[in-house]
Amino acid sequence: MSDPSFPQGDAGSQDAARRWRVGVLGATGLVGQRLVKLLADHPWFELTEVAASERSSGKTYANAVHWHLDGPIPAVARDLVVKGLDPSLDCDFVFSALDSSVAGQTEEDFARAGYPVLSNSKNHRMDPDVPLLIPEVNASHLDAISFQQKNRGYDTGFIVTNPNCSTAGLVLVLKPLADAFGLEKIFVVTLQAVSGAGYPGVASMDIHGNVVPFISGEEEKMESEPQKLLGKWDGTRFIEAGLGLSAHCNRVPVLDGHTECVSLSLKKVASLAEVREALRDFEVSAELASLPSAVRHPVVVLDEQDRPQPRRDANVGNGMAAVVGRVRECPLLDVKLTLLSHNLVRGAAGGALLNAELLAARGFFKGRSVVEGEALAEPVSR
Protein backbone atom coordinates (compact mmCIF):
# COMPACT_ATOMS: atom_id res chain seq x y z
CA MET A 1 0.00 0.00 0.00
CA SER A 2 1.12 3.57 -0.57
CA ASP A 3 1.94 5.58 2.54
CA PRO A 4 -1.04 7.95 2.96
CA SER A 5 1.33 10.66 4.16
CA PHE A 6 2.74 10.87 0.65
CA PRO A 7 -0.04 11.54 -1.88
CA GLN A 8 0.61 10.18 -5.34
CA GLY A 9 -0.16 12.36 -8.35
CA ASP A 10 -2.42 11.56 -11.25
CA ALA A 11 -0.81 10.19 -14.38
CA GLY A 12 0.27 12.86 -16.82
CA SER A 13 -1.41 13.44 -20.15
CA GLN A 14 1.71 13.20 -22.32
CA ASP A 15 1.32 10.49 -25.00
CA ALA A 16 -1.88 9.36 -23.30
CA ALA A 17 -2.55 6.61 -25.87
CA ARG A 18 0.78 4.88 -25.27
CA ARG A 19 2.41 2.50 -22.85
CA TRP A 20 6.16 2.35 -23.30
CA ARG A 21 7.95 -0.97 -23.70
CA VAL A 22 10.94 -1.29 -21.39
CA GLY A 23 14.08 -3.40 -21.20
CA VAL A 24 16.30 -3.91 -18.16
CA LEU A 25 20.02 -4.47 -18.69
CA GLY A 26 21.59 -6.31 -15.77
CA ALA A 27 18.17 -7.62 -14.77
CA THR A 28 19.48 -10.44 -12.57
CA GLY A 29 21.40 -8.22 -10.10
CA LEU A 30 19.96 -6.59 -6.98
CA VAL A 31 19.17 -3.25 -8.63
CA GLY A 32 17.90 -5.03 -11.74
CA GLN A 33 15.58 -7.14 -9.60
CA ARG A 34 14.26 -4.04 -7.85
CA LEU A 35 13.56 -2.48 -11.27
CA VAL A 36 11.73 -5.61 -12.41
CA LYS A 37 9.58 -5.51 -9.28
CA LEU A 38 8.79 -1.79 -9.64
CA LEU A 39 7.93 -2.21 -13.33
CA ALA A 40 5.59 -5.16 -12.75
CA ASP A 41 2.57 -2.97 -11.95
CA HIS A 42 3.69 0.29 -13.51
CA PRO A 43 0.85 2.25 -15.16
CA TRP A 44 3.00 3.73 -17.95
CA PHE A 45 5.70 1.14 -18.65
CA GLU A 46 5.51 -2.48 -19.76
CA LEU A 47 8.48 -4.78 -19.10
CA THR A 48 9.14 -6.65 -22.35
CA GLU A 49 12.87 -7.44 -22.27
CA VAL A 50 15.40 -8.56 -19.67
CA ALA A 51 19.08 -8.77 -20.54
CA ALA A 52 22.17 -9.91 -18.69
CA SER A 53 25.52 -11.62 -19.18
CA GLU A 54 26.07 -14.53 -21.53
CA ARG A 55 25.91 -16.85 -18.50
CA SER A 56 22.19 -16.05 -18.16
CA SER A 57 21.36 -15.52 -21.82
CA GLY A 58 18.85 -17.98 -23.26
CA LYS A 59 17.32 -18.96 -19.92
CA THR A 60 13.97 -17.83 -18.65
CA TYR A 61 14.24 -15.05 -16.11
CA ALA A 62 12.93 -17.38 -13.38
CA ASN A 63 15.72 -19.86 -14.10
CA ALA A 64 18.44 -17.24 -14.50
CA VAL A 65 17.83 -15.04 -11.45
CA HIS A 66 18.67 -15.72 -7.80
CA TRP A 67 15.70 -13.72 -6.47
CA HIS A 68 16.53 -11.79 -3.29
CA LEU A 69 13.51 -9.52 -2.82
CA ASP A 70 10.40 -10.11 -0.73
CA GLY A 71 7.61 -11.89 -2.55
CA PRO A 72 7.75 -14.00 -5.70
CA ILE A 73 9.25 -13.07 -9.04
CA PRO A 74 6.62 -10.92 -10.80
CA ALA A 75 4.52 -12.93 -13.23
CA VAL A 76 5.26 -10.48 -16.06
CA ALA A 77 8.97 -11.36 -15.83
CA ARG A 78 9.05 -15.06 -14.96
CA ASP A 79 8.87 -16.44 -18.48
CA LEU A 80 10.75 -13.70 -20.31
CA VAL A 81 13.82 -15.12 -22.03
CA VAL A 82 17.00 -13.38 -20.92
CA LYS A 83 18.79 -11.78 -23.86
CA GLY A 84 22.43 -10.83 -24.23
CA LEU A 85 23.68 -7.25 -24.09
CA ASP A 86 23.14 -6.58 -27.78
CA PRO A 87 21.27 -3.41 -28.85
CA SER A 88 18.52 -5.29 -30.69
CA LEU A 89 15.92 -5.53 -27.93
CA ASP A 90 12.21 -5.10 -28.66
CA CYS A 91 11.60 -2.08 -26.44
CA ASP A 92 11.47 1.71 -26.52
CA PHE A 93 14.09 2.46 -23.87
CA VAL A 94 16.29 0.60 -21.41
CA PHE A 95 17.29 0.83 -17.80
CA SER A 96 20.89 -0.08 -17.14
CA ALA A 97 21.72 -1.80 -13.85
CA LEU A 98 24.95 -3.17 -15.27
CA ASP A 99 28.20 -3.57 -13.41
CA SER A 100 30.60 -0.75 -14.17
CA SER A 101 33.02 -3.20 -15.80
CA VAL A 102 30.67 -3.52 -18.79
CA ALA A 103 28.25 -0.60 -18.45
CA GLY A 104 30.27 2.12 -20.15
CA GLN A 105 30.57 0.69 -23.65
CA THR A 106 27.26 -1.19 -23.53
CA GLU A 107 25.30 1.95 -22.67
CA GLU A 108 27.00 3.87 -25.47
CA ASP A 109 26.18 1.07 -27.92
CA PHE A 110 22.49 1.17 -26.98
CA ALA A 111 22.32 4.97 -27.18
CA ARG A 112 24.02 4.93 -30.57
CA ALA A 113 21.48 2.33 -31.76
CA GLY A 114 18.63 4.71 -30.86
CA TYR A 115 17.68 3.61 -27.35
CA PRO A 116 17.30 6.12 -24.53
CA VAL A 117 19.39 4.70 -21.67
CA LEU A 118 18.47 5.34 -18.03
CA SER A 119 21.64 4.34 -16.21
CA ASN A 120 22.24 3.47 -12.58
CA SER A 121 25.92 2.79 -13.28
CA LYS A 122 28.75 5.17 -12.44
CA ASN A 123 30.46 5.22 -15.83
CA HIS A 124 28.80 8.23 -17.48
CA ARG A 125 27.65 10.24 -14.44
CA MET A 126 30.36 12.85 -14.72
CA ASP A 127 30.53 12.98 -18.53
CA PRO A 128 30.38 16.65 -19.59
CA ASP A 129 27.30 16.15 -21.80
CA VAL A 130 25.33 13.60 -19.74
CA PRO A 131 22.63 14.71 -17.26
CA LEU A 132 23.09 13.41 -13.73
CA LEU A 133 19.48 13.66 -12.64
CA ILE A 134 17.34 13.92 -9.53
CA PRO A 135 14.04 15.32 -10.88
CA GLU A 136 13.20 17.27 -7.71
CA VAL A 137 16.64 18.91 -7.80
CA ASN A 138 17.77 19.59 -11.36
CA ALA A 139 15.13 18.72 -13.97
CA SER A 140 16.43 21.61 -16.09
CA HIS A 141 19.59 19.59 -16.76
CA LEU A 142 17.58 17.56 -19.27
CA ASP A 143 18.28 20.46 -21.63
CA ALA A 144 21.69 18.83 -22.13
CA ILE A 145 20.18 15.88 -24.01
CA SER A 146 19.91 17.65 -27.37
CA PHE A 147 23.52 18.82 -27.04
CA GLN A 148 24.61 15.27 -26.16
CA GLN A 149 22.84 13.84 -29.20
CA LYS A 150 24.45 16.37 -31.52
CA ASN A 151 27.84 16.04 -29.83
CA ARG A 152 27.90 12.23 -30.02
CA GLY A 153 26.00 11.73 -33.26
CA TYR A 154 23.07 9.97 -31.57
CA ASP A 155 19.66 10.10 -33.27
CA THR A 156 16.84 9.21 -30.87
CA GLY A 157 19.14 7.66 -28.28
CA PHE A 158 20.78 9.33 -25.29
CA ILE A 159 22.11 8.59 -21.80
CA VAL A 160 20.72 9.96 -18.54
CA THR A 161 22.16 8.82 -15.22
CA ASN A 162 21.06 8.80 -11.61
CA PRO A 163 23.56 9.45 -8.81
CA ASN A 164 25.36 7.24 -6.35
CA CYS A 165 23.03 5.81 -3.71
CA SER A 166 24.41 7.97 -0.87
CA THR A 167 24.58 11.09 -3.02
CA ALA A 168 20.87 10.79 -3.86
CA GLY A 169 19.64 11.14 -0.29
CA LEU A 170 22.18 13.81 0.60
CA VAL A 171 21.38 16.09 -2.34
CA LEU A 172 17.62 15.75 -1.84
CA VAL A 173 18.15 17.26 1.62
CA LEU A 174 20.70 19.85 0.49
CA LYS A 175 18.46 21.23 -2.29
CA PRO A 176 15.88 23.09 -0.14
CA LEU A 177 18.63 24.41 2.12
CA ALA A 178 20.63 25.63 -0.87
CA ASP A 179 17.56 27.39 -2.25
CA ALA A 180 16.59 28.99 1.06
CA PHE A 181 19.93 29.91 2.60
CA GLY A 182 22.78 29.00 0.25
CA LEU A 183 25.45 26.43 1.10
CA GLU A 184 29.18 26.83 1.67
CA LYS A 185 30.60 23.67 3.26
CA ILE A 186 29.28 20.16 3.85
CA PHE A 187 30.88 17.42 5.96
CA VAL A 188 29.21 14.01 5.78
CA VAL A 189 29.82 10.61 7.37
CA THR A 190 27.86 7.69 5.92
CA LEU A 191 26.69 4.42 7.46
CA GLN A 192 25.90 2.39 4.35
CA ALA A 193 23.83 -0.79 4.15
CA VAL A 194 25.30 -4.02 2.82
CA SER A 195 22.75 -4.24 -0.01
CA GLY A 196 24.59 -1.31 -1.58
CA ALA A 197 27.45 -3.70 -2.34
CA GLY A 198 25.22 -5.99 -4.40
CA TYR A 199 25.12 -9.77 -4.03
CA PRO A 200 27.05 -11.62 -2.66
CA GLY A 201 28.51 -8.28 -1.58
CA VAL A 202 30.47 -8.04 1.66
CA ALA A 203 31.50 -11.37 3.19
CA SER A 204 29.59 -12.13 6.40
CA MET A 205 32.84 -12.64 8.35
CA ASP A 206 33.89 -9.11 7.36
CA ILE A 207 30.67 -7.29 8.24
CA HIS A 208 29.02 -9.25 11.07
CA GLY A 209 29.52 -7.30 14.30
CA ASN A 210 31.83 -4.92 12.45
CA VAL A 211 32.15 -1.65 10.54
CA VAL A 212 34.30 -1.39 7.41
CA PRO A 213 35.60 2.20 7.04
CA PHE A 214 36.26 2.01 3.30
CA ILE A 215 34.06 1.65 0.20
CA SER A 216 36.07 1.86 -2.99
CA GLY A 217 35.41 5.06 -4.94
CA GLU A 218 32.49 6.08 -2.73
CA GLU A 219 33.98 9.16 -1.11
CA GLU A 220 35.12 10.51 -4.46
CA LYS A 221 31.59 10.12 -5.86
CA MET A 222 30.02 11.87 -2.88
CA GLU A 223 32.45 14.76 -3.15
CA SER A 224 32.01 15.26 -6.91
CA GLU A 225 28.42 14.34 -7.82
CA PRO A 226 26.67 16.98 -5.65
CA GLN A 227 28.71 19.67 -7.42
CA LYS A 228 27.15 18.66 -10.74
CA LEU A 229 23.65 18.03 -9.37
CA LEU A 230 23.46 21.42 -7.65
CA GLY A 231 25.22 23.21 -10.49
CA LYS A 232 23.85 24.60 -13.76
CA TRP A 233 23.75 23.69 -17.46
CA ASP A 234 24.76 26.70 -19.56
CA GLY A 235 23.94 25.25 -22.98
CA THR A 236 27.28 23.60 -23.67
CA ARG A 237 28.58 22.43 -20.29
CA PHE A 238 27.73 21.90 -16.64
CA ILE A 239 28.95 24.56 -14.22
CA GLU A 240 29.65 23.07 -10.79
CA ALA A 241 28.15 24.44 -7.59
CA GLY A 242 31.53 25.21 -6.02
CA LEU A 243 30.78 23.68 -2.62
CA GLY A 244 33.33 22.65 -0.04
CA LEU A 245 32.49 18.99 0.53
CA SER A 246 34.21 16.22 2.51
CA ALA A 247 32.89 12.66 2.90
CA HIS A 248 33.74 9.63 5.02
CA CYS A 249 32.01 6.42 3.86
CA ASN A 250 31.51 3.30 6.00
CA ARG A 251 29.86 -0.08 5.40
CA VAL A 252 27.75 -1.22 8.37
CA PRO A 253 25.75 -4.41 9.16
CA VAL A 254 22.37 -3.03 8.04
CA LEU A 255 20.43 -4.64 5.19
CA ASP A 256 18.76 -1.64 3.50
CA GLY A 257 18.95 2.11 4.09
CA HIS A 258 21.93 4.47 4.09
CA THR A 259 22.26 6.75 7.13
CA GLU A 260 24.28 9.96 6.84
CA CYS A 261 25.46 12.34 9.56
CA VAL A 262 25.81 15.79 8.01
CA SER A 263 27.26 19.10 9.21
CA LEU A 264 26.97 22.15 6.98
CA SER A 265 27.56 25.87 6.85
CA LEU A 266 25.02 28.25 5.33
CA LYS A 267 25.58 31.48 3.41
CA LYS A 268 22.67 33.17 5.23
CA VAL A 269 22.09 33.01 8.97
CA ALA A 270 19.11 30.76 9.79
CA SER A 271 17.57 29.49 13.00
CA LEU A 272 17.00 25.78 13.54
CA ALA A 273 13.27 26.41 13.20
CA GLU A 274 13.84 28.02 9.81
CA VAL A 275 16.00 25.09 8.69
CA ARG A 276 13.33 22.58 9.72
CA GLU A 277 10.66 24.67 8.01
CA ALA A 278 12.64 24.82 4.75
CA LEU A 279 13.02 21.04 4.77
CA ARG A 280 9.37 20.37 5.65
CA ASP A 281 8.08 22.84 3.05
CA PHE A 282 10.08 21.30 0.19
CA GLU A 283 7.35 20.26 -2.26
CA VAL A 284 7.61 19.06 -5.83
CA SER A 285 6.14 20.94 -8.78
CA ALA A 286 2.76 20.02 -10.24
CA GLU A 287 4.58 18.40 -13.15
CA LEU A 288 6.55 16.10 -10.86
CA ALA A 289 3.56 15.42 -8.61
CA SER A 290 1.83 13.92 -11.66
CA LEU A 291 4.47 11.20 -12.01
CA PRO A 292 3.50 7.77 -10.65
CA SER A 293 6.62 7.27 -8.50
CA ALA A 294 6.87 10.80 -7.11
CA VAL A 295 6.14 11.80 -3.53
CA ARG A 296 4.80 15.29 -2.99
CA HIS A 297 7.15 15.97 -0.07
CA PRO A 298 10.44 14.19 -0.84
CA VAL A 299 12.03 15.26 2.46
CA VAL A 300 10.37 14.19 5.71
CA VAL A 301 11.45 15.68 9.04
CA LEU A 302 10.99 13.64 12.23
CA ASP A 303 11.01 15.17 15.70
CA GLU A 304 11.92 12.06 17.70
CA GLN A 305 15.43 12.21 19.15
CA ASP A 306 16.33 8.68 18.04
CA ARG A 307 15.17 8.83 14.41
CA PRO A 308 15.60 8.18 11.54
CA GLN A 309 16.45 4.47 11.77
CA PRO A 310 16.91 2.15 8.76
CA ARG A 311 14.62 -0.59 10.07
CA ARG A 312 11.79 1.81 10.81
CA ASP A 313 12.16 4.56 8.23
CA ALA A 314 13.84 3.29 5.04
CA ASN A 315 10.48 2.68 3.34
CA VAL A 316 8.91 6.06 4.13
CA GLY A 317 7.29 7.41 0.98
CA ASN A 318 7.57 3.97 -0.64
CA GLY A 319 11.34 4.31 -0.30
CA MET A 320 11.43 7.53 -2.33
CA ALA A 321 11.71 10.06 0.52
CA ALA A 322 14.79 11.22 2.42
CA VAL A 323 14.04 11.17 6.14
CA VAL A 324 15.72 13.80 8.35
CA GLY A 325 16.08 13.94 12.11
CA ARG A 326 18.23 15.45 14.87
CA VAL A 327 18.43 18.92 13.34
CA ARG A 328 20.60 20.88 15.75
CA GLU A 329 23.34 23.47 16.04
CA CYS A 330 26.86 22.47 15.01
CA PRO A 331 29.73 23.91 17.09
CA LEU A 332 32.11 23.77 14.09
CA LEU A 333 29.83 24.72 11.19
CA ASP A 334 26.22 25.98 11.44
CA VAL A 335 23.79 23.06 11.42
CA LYS A 336 24.05 19.30 11.79
CA LEU A 337 21.45 16.62 11.08
CA THR A 338 20.97 12.93 10.39
CA LEU A 339 19.35 11.68 7.19
CA LEU A 340 18.28 8.31 5.85
CA SER A 341 17.33 7.12 2.37
CA HIS A 342 16.60 3.72 0.83
CA ASN A 343 19.68 2.88 -1.20
CA LEU A 344 17.95 0.45 -3.58
CA VAL A 345 14.84 2.58 -4.17
CA ARG A 346 15.55 6.33 -4.05
CA GLY A 347 19.27 5.62 -4.43
CA ALA A 348 18.99 3.24 -7.38
CA ALA A 349 15.97 1.61 -9.06
CA GLY A 350 13.31 4.05 -7.85
CA GLY A 351 15.43 7.04 -8.78
CA ALA A 352 15.99 5.68 -12.28
CA LEU A 353 12.27 4.96 -12.64
CA LEU A 354 11.33 8.50 -11.63
CA ASN A 355 13.83 9.83 -14.17
CA ALA A 356 12.17 7.73 -16.87
CA GLU A 357 8.72 8.98 -15.90
CA LEU A 358 9.85 12.59 -16.23
CA LEU A 359 11.42 11.88 -19.62
CA ALA A 360 8.20 10.20 -20.79
CA ALA A 361 6.07 13.10 -19.57
CA ARG A 362 8.29 15.59 -21.41
CA GLY A 363 8.17 13.65 -24.67
CA PHE A 364 11.78 12.47 -24.83
CA PHE A 365 10.83 8.89 -25.79
CA LYS A 366 10.13 8.69 -29.51
CA GLY A 367 9.03 5.07 -29.51
CA ARG A 368 10.52 2.07 -31.30
CA SER A 369 7.65 -0.34 -30.62
CA VAL A 370 4.95 1.51 -28.75
CA VAL A 371 1.87 -0.38 -27.62
CA GLU A 372 -0.96 1.68 -29.10
CA GLY A 373 -4.47 1.96 -27.75
CA GLU A 374 -3.63 1.49 -24.06
CA ALA A 375 -4.07 4.72 -22.13
CA LEU A 376 -1.67 5.65 -19.38
CA ALA A 377 -3.35 4.47 -16.21
CA GLU A 378 -3.70 6.09 -12.82
CA PRO A 379 -0.70 5.46 -10.55
CA VAL A 380 -0.97 2.22 -8.62
CA SER A 381 -0.20 1.45 -4.98
CA ARG A 382 2.97 -0.52 -4.36
Tell where the protein language model's regions lie, with residue ranges:
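N-terminal Rossmann-like NAD(P) cofactor-binding subdomain of oxidoreductases
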Residues: S2-F214, R237-F238, L243-G244, A322-V323, ...
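Charged docking surfaces used in two-component/phosphorelay signaling
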Residues: V194-R382
